[in-house]
Amino acid sequence: MENLCDKCSSVIYSKEYHQCLANSTTRNFIVCNSTTINYDSLTMKQLCELANGGNKQVQKIILDRIQFFSYGSVPHRYIEFKKWEYFMDKIPHNQNYVRLYLCWIYYNCMEIDGSIIAHIKNLAKMCNIDAQTNYGLVNEYGIGVKKNIKKAIKWYKLSCYKENLFGLLFLGSLYERGYGVSCDKHMAFNLYEKATKHNYPAVKRQLAFMYRTGSGTTKNINKSHELYREAANQGYPLAQYALALQCKYGHGCIKNYKEAETWLIRSYNNGCLYATYSLARLYIETKSPLRNYSRAFELMQEAASENYLLAINYLAKIYKNGIGVNKNISRAIYWYYKAGNSTKITELLEINNSVIINTLDCNIFTCLDSIENEILFDIQLYILKYKYGDKCDYNLQLYQQLETIVFECIKLRNALDKSSALTTCLKPITKEYRDELSKFTIDTDVFVKHYYFNKQTYMTFGKANVKLSDDIIFFLSKKPYINIVNKLICLNKTNIDTVKDIKSINSKLQKYANLFVRYIEETVNIRNTMFQIKFSFIFR
């Protein structure tokens, strides 16, 4: 759990330093002596928050760590480079920083200043090998220019003639993937090997992967483990993550959960999203003393909140099975929806067919009106009888309770007719709907719940404040009137005619409940136009 300040409620990132927003004497205080700040204890996310807030010292610390990271290891999701004065002052002149900036622009789908591209191109033509690599990157991903893989290969090859680190890495990646060139794993392996003289951790990690899978070279698990460990010790998050998995499963080493935890924590602290998920899994799947359900739940929530699909599915499983939390089928359904996993939803609800909203013209409404009047007439007749005739106060109280229940049902139905509630609208949502659903949260926008009635599974899906149809089904399925009817029969069991009348009322009540459920199933529609627009993707 994050440690919060008692005064300003903001996160305390280190014991040595905290910029309290509630204390005017320290509000604008910036520590100049870095030795008083334990930056090593901060995660990459926390460091980025400080850097985004204008702390130049932290900006420099982060850049020193990531300037030789590959695209997949840089925590772009936490970084706001345009707020980093220290960084932007060196664009477009420092080509290492330019490469990071290009990747960040691509990750965030942002526009880039054309003058930066022009500057890179001019330097590339002047045989600046770092600029040649960057201009290849510009053309490969279409950053500020039209995507052109042939041009990208040309510039990568030019930089490779002088064995530029990133030129070798990027060209090797193209051969490994077969993108723009014929797939040649052996060529990729040779290019990565050439780059190893730079002692660059990302290259070691690529070679480790190829040794592990036997791609482009002879399979060698021990060599793979050795390279992963070297890159991990250099602080490379993806290598730390891979090494942790090898320690967890005993690939190339003796199985060691404690060491796996150590490397996953380091990788997580360096901003690796995969490590967040895997660390949560480790805390769930191992035995004591490592097992920690509460921490696992926090980590899985964190990974799911960043739309990591494996974490979203696993979080649904946590809610489904009550792993470290109370079982919550509604939230399980919600997270399976976010993952686009309709199969799991169907399994969860124990039904074979999905049902969508259905509006039918029928006479059930009239039937409900009619049976309501019949039931109320019978009940009120008995109320009068016991009130002015027989002196059985307890009978009178029970009939009055029964009358209240029927009036409550009528009230609920009237409210339902005026609402935008809906029911039986479960429809498998495929991956194409996931982005739409991710805009909403279970707490603020969506009400999702399942229930059983007469051996059938139902589901409501609607606005959080509109759950009337579910309330009604729950109310009817509990049949609160049954206990009252049973008590009335027990009190009057010696009077055969009275018991017969009570059973007649009970029969009508059960028929009424079943008709009410059918009414909800067949006629409840989405009547709120704004609601229809907002959630229209559900009913495509």
UniProtKB/Swiss-Prot annotation:
Disulfide bonds: none annotated. It comes from the Viruses. Keywords: Repeat. SMART domains: SEL1. Sel1-like repeats lie at residues 129-164, 165-200, 201-236, 237-272, 273-308, 309-344. PANTHER family: ERAD-ASSOCIATED E3 UBIQUITIN-PROTEIN LIGASE COMPONENT HRD3, SEL-1-LIKE PROTEIN. This is Putative sel1-like repeat-containing protein R815.
